[in-house]
Amino acid sequence: MSKIAKLGSFTLVSGVVATSCYYYFIDRDGYHYKRSVWKQVGDEVQRVIDRKPSLVFSKEKYGDQFDYDYKVSGERVERVPVDHKQLVLRYNSETMKDLWNKEVRALVDWVYSR
């Protein structure tokens, strides 16, 4: 009887995990995964590490009204829009500090909210 119970519980748990993974990652083209906070933070950190601009406009949200060229000089990254107004981004080190402070504040809020 215990072997049947173990097999049944293993089957139930693996079925629930597989179903959860399916609905989280595959169903609706990964809607929940792409919008999760951990993925957004991970993507932002990866952009900083790759020295890509941290200010990103999505075409689906803003359309084609933002067309930029990128100009890199040292650590400074500048975006030059089509109408030639300059939008200057901050240093990568400042962005890393802001990411660190954001995560520390979120952790402190979580610790003291309990």
From Swiss-Prot:
Q: Does the keyword Acyltransferase apply?
A: no
Q: Which cystines does this chain contain?
A: none
- Record's GO cellular component, any one? MICOS complex
| NAD in keyword set | no
The principal location of this protein is mitochondrion
What compartments host this protein?
Mitochondrion inner membrane
User: What is the recorded membrane topology of this protein?
Assistant: Single-pass membrane protein
| Superkingdom to which the source organism belongs | Eukaryota
Q: Report the InterPro entries cross-referenced here.
A: Mic12
- Which keywords fit this entry according to its UniProt record? Membrane, Mitochondrion, Mitochondrion inner membrane, Transmembrane, Transmembrane helix
Q: Name one GO biological process term.
A: cristae formation
User: Can you tell me where the transmembrane regions are?
Assistant: 4-26
Describe, as the record does, how this protein assembles with itself and its partners: Component of the mitochondrial contact site and cristae organizing system (MICOS) complex.
Family from the record: Belongs to the MICOS complex subunit Mic12 family.
Q: Explain the purpose of this protein.
A: Component of the MICOS complex, a large protein complex of the mitochondrial inner membrane that plays crucial roles in the maintenance of crista junctions, inner membrane architecture, and formation of contact sites to the outer membrane.
- Any idea what this protein is called? MICOS complex subunit MIC12
Which organism's genome codes for this protein?
Answer: Candida glabrata (strain ATCC 2001 / BCRC 20586 / JCM 3761 / NBRC 0622 / NRRL Y-65 / CBS 138)
Q: Which gene is transcribed and translated to give this protein?
A: AIM5
